């Protein structure tokens, strides 16, 4: 007797799944509660131009003891550099900071190099070897160097030594203290028939300053130009105006720049900084004279807030506004250069949200992102509220990742906005326990008087948290990179290229180098970048995606799976991508392999389905797709089908 299907009697096949991962990673909640277009985890994944989730691009090394296999055939111009670029760095040297220094004379990278015995600066550019900058020694205790370019000078500080700068001729120079910074005319005199002679008193030791008078058409002395600022002055010298008709002027002396400067920032043609000297009130903000980072007026400082809350970061915002991030508050200084500094407005932005790392601050479009004590926040988010409200951090969807950051090493965090992505390099604690919340170097003391210390804590950034500004979503994190300092560059021969000082974990023979991110390479759907661009220094890394936990839109009853269909793409006709597919039931986090060696052949839409009937009953099921071959993994969709079991009255 023939069997006839009955829609009223047979179990209905129910569909569930994800047709695109446009809302990114949401990992700080139950995997079955996140949206269908999100995923629980992504490691070393990115968005392509079409919104597909795809492996991030890799890196190539640009300095140090270059390995020829790292360069391969990505770009011919870069291949030619392996024999010369950076080959003169010390064998065991590591690069821990850098800056793209662009002047009218030339463009170059200035990098801070640690060769295990001495920390010093080098300079170089693609096509040339690196050369050491004489007398540019960095303090041995410094973990990084703060750079700020003002005009044709690159100022730098390490938080322990005095302020110095590199000239456009790549020469290290010290700040000349005790020079005349300005001369103000107090009495202009009258009826001057000629230009009077200006004589400035000599210093106790050093060079005597000189100046020349400026007389207006009405016969008044209107200004005195400094022709030589001199040196060695400890107090303001007297100014004698011979034949000045009663004119009188007062000189001002520029003393030494603030001791142990940190957070160097160029803003409104001034240099700004904070002092790392513990004898200085921690909310003191220093600024140089206009257009002169060498000239620091003794009165050129502001106490922001006046409450002792330490300044943790500075950022040059729009207009004349300087953002001052303190540990527990945020302020702006409206430093209009046409006003006297005493008239600048200092305004409170937020009274209970602060910043934890100066180096995490980065402009993201018209917004500014930074790392606070409770996660990554944005200025636009804060301005949308009030000065006293505290909303969720922008990073709340990935709070579990934020909790893994070593709270004793927040100063190491380094952020950059690049190609519509906010990249924040962070020091993850690599082993449990993660959530300790310590903000000092001391261990915690439990109720049982047992010391708890951070296990697996490293003195380096071993992960990069990624936010995509166009998709407005998080992409989990990238690993295999040890990022000491992101260095955005724009060499005229190559265009914009993101580089970073650091290391690649999978390249065991490498020391800390400067690496370039391969996203500058031409890459389209029909003409993709070379497959070797998905390698880090010629070595492979693992990319993986874990989907949400699917429940066929029925949260209570158990289910029996029928099949799952995965959609991939592979634009390479000469290279298959090997991936592994696994599943986990009931949000257990324990994955069992479905297919350990799926080979994705060339196709714009490669479909693969698996039978789930043999996997037994489950309430939720999620899937993990990963590759560690260094190839390009692109997951387009995950479609699940199954049957809903009966609701059990008791179990």
Where are the language model's segments positioned?
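Beta-sheet repeat architectures centered on beta-propellers
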Residues: 1-131, 137-155, 353-356, 363-367, ...
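Beta-propeller and closely related beta-pinwheel folds
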Residues: 83, 88-91, 131-141, 174, ...
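Predominantly extracellular/luminal cell-surface or secreted proteins
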Residues: 123-124, 166, 201, 242, ...
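Acidic/polar residues in short coil/turn loops that connect beta-strands
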Residues: 126-127, 158-160, 166-169, 218, ...
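Hydrophobic or amphipathic alpha-helical targeting/insertion segments
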Residues: 142-174
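Long, compositionally biased low-complexity repeat segments characteristic
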Residues: 171-180, 431-438
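Conserved, function-critical positions that sit in or immediately flank catalytic
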Residues: 173-255
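Extracellular glycan-recognition/adhesion modules and their associated mucin-like linkers
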Residues: 182, 224, 261-263, 493
């Amino acid at each position: 007797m023939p069997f006839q299907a009955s829609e009223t009697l047979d179990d209905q096949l129910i569909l569930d799944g994800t047709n695109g991962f446009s809302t990114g990673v949401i990992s700080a909640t139950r995997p079955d509660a996140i949206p269908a277009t999100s995923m629980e985890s992504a490691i070393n994944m990115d968005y392509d131009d079409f919104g597909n989730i795809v492996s991030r691009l890799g890196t190539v090394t640009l300095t140090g003891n270059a390995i020829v296999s790292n360069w391969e055939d990505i770009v011919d111009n870069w291949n030619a550099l392996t024999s010369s670029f950076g080959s003169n760095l010390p064998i065991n040297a590591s690069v821990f900071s850098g800056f793209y220094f662009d002047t009218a004379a030339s463009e170059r990278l200035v990098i801070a190099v640690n060769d295990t015995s001495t920390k010093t600066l080098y300079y170089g550019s693609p096509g040339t070897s690196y050369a050491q900058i004489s007398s540019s020694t960095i303090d041995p205790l410094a973990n990084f160097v703060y750079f700020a370019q003002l005009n044709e000078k690159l100022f730098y500080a390490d938080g322990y030594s005095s302020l110095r700068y590199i000239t456009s001729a790549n020469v290290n120079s010290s700040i000349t203290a005790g020079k005349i910074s300005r001369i103000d005319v107090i009495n202009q005199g009258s009826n001057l028939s000629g230009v009077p002679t200006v004589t400035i008193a000599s210093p106790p030791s050093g060079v005597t300053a000189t100046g020349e008078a400026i007389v207006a058409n009405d016969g008044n002395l209107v200004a005195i130009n400094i022709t030589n600022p001199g040196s060695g002055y400890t107090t303001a010298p007297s100014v004698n105006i011979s034949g000045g008709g009663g004119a009188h002027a007062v000189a001002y002396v520029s003393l030494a720049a603030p001791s142990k400067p940190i957070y160097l920032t160029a803003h409104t043609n001034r240099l700004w900084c904070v002092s790392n000297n513990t004898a200085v009130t921690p909310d003191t903000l220093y600024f140089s004279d206009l257009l002169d980072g060498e000239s620091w007026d003794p009165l050129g400082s502001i106490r922001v807030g006046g409450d002792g809350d330490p300044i943790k970061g500075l950022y040059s915002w729009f207009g004349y506004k300087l953002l001052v991030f303190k540990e527990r508050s945020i302020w702006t200084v409206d430093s209009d250069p046409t006003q006297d500094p005493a008239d600048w407005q200092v305004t409170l932005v937020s009274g209970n949200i602060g910043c934890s790392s100066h180096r995490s601050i980065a402009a993201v479009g018209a917004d500014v992102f930074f790392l606070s004590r409770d996660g990554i926040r944005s200025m636009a988010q804060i301005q949308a509220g009030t000065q006293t409200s505290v909303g969720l951090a922008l990073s709340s969807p990935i709070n579990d990742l934020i909790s893994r950051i070593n709270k004793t090493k927040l100063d190491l965090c380094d952020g950059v906005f690049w190609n519509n992505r906010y990249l924040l390099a962070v020091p993850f604690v690599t082993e449990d326990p993660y959530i300790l919340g310590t903000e000092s170097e001391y261990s915690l003391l439990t109720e049982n008087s047992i010391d708890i210390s951070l296990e697996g804590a490293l003195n380096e950034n071993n992960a990069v948290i990624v936010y995509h500004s166009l998709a407005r979503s998080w992409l989990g994190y990238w690993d295999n990179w040890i990022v000491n300092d992101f260095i955005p560059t724009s060499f005229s021969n190559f265009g914009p290229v993101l580089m970073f000082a650091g290391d690649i974990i999978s390249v065991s023979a490498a020391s800390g180098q400067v690496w370039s991110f391969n996203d500058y390479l031409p890459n389209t759907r029909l003409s993709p970048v070379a497959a070797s661009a998905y390698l880090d220094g010629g070595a492979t890394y693992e990319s993986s995606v874990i989907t949400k936990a699917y429940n066929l839109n029925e949260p209570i009853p158990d289910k029996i799976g029928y099949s799952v269909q995965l959609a991939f793409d592979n634009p390479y006709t000469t290279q298959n991508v090997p991936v592994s597919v696994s599943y986990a039931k009931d949000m257990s986090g324990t994955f069992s392999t479905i297919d350990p060696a799926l080979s994705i052949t060339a196709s714009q839409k490669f479909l693969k389905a698996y039978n789930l009937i043999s996997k037994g009953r489950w309430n939720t099921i999620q899937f993990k797709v990963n590759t560690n071959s260094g190839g390009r993994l692109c997951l387009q969709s995950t479609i699940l089908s199954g049957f809903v079991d009966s609701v059990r009255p008791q179990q």
